Amino acid sequence: PTETQLKQELKQAESSKNAPNQAETTEALQSALNWLAERKESQTRSEQYQKVIDDFPKMTQELRRQLVLESNKILPNGDDLPAAELEQQILQTSSLLLEQARLLQQEQDHTREISDSLGQLPQQQTDARRALTEVQRRLQAQPANPTTPYAQAALALLQTEAAARKAKVDELELA
């Protein structure tokens, strides 16, 4: 079911105050909407991961080009510069080095976070696959054509949960 369909069904369920299982129906539909949102987030992250993967060769080529340009820069030797100008260059270089050291520390922290998360990735993948298998099993146990609003909402909930869990498995496979 789509987000629009679920929102319409939720409005109908909320307005049907005397319907049997009204609270459970609205809760199931709201949960289904939450699963759709989670699925959308996983798909967005998957797209971002894929973009990074696709852009990696171009990015590394650009970084290599910048490295060559930096290493080919000719620095003044300072023989013909006044002391005040040399001191100014030293201050600028020192400031630049401090900034680069700060950026390097940030990169090292980020690399450490990535390394830590990579260590957890196999377990996360296993857990996500297990959860997907479980929801698919529950989905297959549901009647194909539910007749009550609550049964329809429960089916929609399982369908959206299965879609969200599948998107999470796909996301973790790209990570």
Task: Report residues per predicted region.
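Flexible, low-complexity extramembrane segments of multi-pass membrane transporters/channels
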Residues: P1-A175
